Amino acid sequence: MVTGPEKPGIGFPSVLDSAYKDYKRHMKVSDIMSRGVFTTTADTPMAKAVRIMGERHIGSLIVMKFMSPLAIVTERDVLSKVLAGGLDLETTLVEDVMSYPLIKICPTLEIREAARTMIHKKGRLAVFECGELTGVITASDLIREMPDAPETSLGVDEFMTKEVVSVSEDEPVATVAGIMGKKRIGSVIVERDGKPAGIFTERDLLSKFLVFEKSLDTPVGKAASSPLKTAAAGISIHEAAKIMAAQHVRRLPLMKKKQIYGIITARDLVEAYAR
């Protein structure tokens, strides 16, 4: 049977799409890691470490000792170990609260394996090549490049946190920071007249208050990010990752019947992807 010539372009987009999806699924750590590594030293006061993180809008610093990478200190350490622990930022040293040892990975590792390491070891990852520190990997780095694949097609509802902590916009930031530190959570929903109006995060605490030594007696409503960015409950892990990356957020409240149904974080998405 004689057939005519194929029409140009038929199947070509799908081949490209398939190849791109396959490339995304097998990306390496070196493709997505943050190469600008900020450091501090073990004997640095936490007040100075906080200023660096706040000014740079970053969530962690690699801790150096004797010119070698030793550990990591994070914005969560500021909340849960310093503020919630009643410690003083000026007198507390980085080595008093840092996480040790440093979790090290290779730049040639595929990103899903990096996600599994992050969840298993419970922390940010330091990338080493030939013994040299070359970058860091955070949950935000991973969700920015999360592939559209079977493992990311699951619904977010299974992985979200249903118990969402809310506070009134009139609560002082000091009180809110105490709640976040004791509960070991990175954000609270801020309500106005009993309705969700914004979100206050550990990054807000660092970059808007601690770095400027601003009074924590300020009502949290004045510092919350508003309007609240949300998504519908039931979306896929991949869809949630795309929204977070596009909106430059790490926490996404999920709505159902015009009510907050839960909240999903970048780390939750990484945990789902790592399965």
What are these regions (language model features)?
Residues M1-R275:
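Tandem CBS (Cystathionine beta-synthase) repeat/Bateman regulatory domains
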